Regions:
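RNA-binding accessory domains that recognize and position tRNA/RNA substrates
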Residues: 1-147, 164-194, 198-201
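Hydrophobic/small residue at the entry helix of a nucleotide-binding pocket
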Residues: 157
Length: 203
């Protein structure tokens, strides 16, 4: 029996237990709870800057975004044992969304499967079972979209992207995860002020 099969037999269920949203005057904190029963619990989190006089309390659109970020986070912990079943105890998923997430996960795990010699099937590698409900009730306020948001990692691709868009006259804001000197340098080199950079923190 391979380790893949052994781990799946020993840890048949992975749980996406919950997410929690808290906000202060200038930021929103998000925390998640994932669990491999009998083995480990995981509690990653994010912090996002927030404009003054803006609240996300009860905002269903924001809650959906937070839930989806959790679905993207979960795979990093699921792959520790590759449980054949993932029970999602929060948020909501319909059949089409489940298929979409399975496709995204499977494609994103290609190198992981290859390096570890895992012969996984895209249909049966995981069964996603939704059991939750959203708490939010109000739709987000409609806002007019202006300019573009450019993800910045500090490498050549993001530097070229932001330079091209700025030179084309686009109104650009930059988005980064866990600020580093190379990220600030990329924004500055594009001729943008530091205030054009939105930085989220992952913990």
């Amino acid at each position: 029996m391979s380790k893949y099969e052994q781990f799946r037999r020993e840890h048949s269920v992975f749980l996406y237990r919950s997410y929690e949203i808290t906000e202060s005057a200038d930021k929103v904190d998000v925390s998640y709870k994932f669990s491999i029963p009998g083995l480990a619990d995981f509690n990653p989190g994010w912090s996002f800057p927030k404009p003054e006089n803006v609240s996300v309390s009860g905002d269903l659109t924001f809650e959906r975004l937070v839930f989806s970020l959790g679905m993207a986070e979960a795979v990093s912990y699921w792959k520790a044992v590759c449980s054949p079943e993932m029970i999602v105890e929060c948020g909501e998923l319909d059949g089409e969304q489940i298929s979409w997430w399975k496709k995204l996960w499977f494609a994103g795990l290609g190198e992981f499967f290859y390096v570890n010699g895992i012969n996984a099937d895209k249909e049966s590698f995981v069964k996603i079972v939704p059991k939750g409900k959203f708490a939010g009730t109000s739709a987000a306020e409609l806002r007019k979209s202006e300019g573009c948001l450019v993800p910045i990692g500090g490498g050549k691709d993001s530097a070229l992207t932001i330079e091209t868009l700025v030179n084309a006259g686009m109104n650009c804001r930059c988005y980064a995860i866990n600020k580093r000197c190379s990220i600030s340098a990329t924004v500055e080199a594009a001729g943008l002020d530091e205030s054009a950079l939105i930085t989220a923190s992952r913990r």
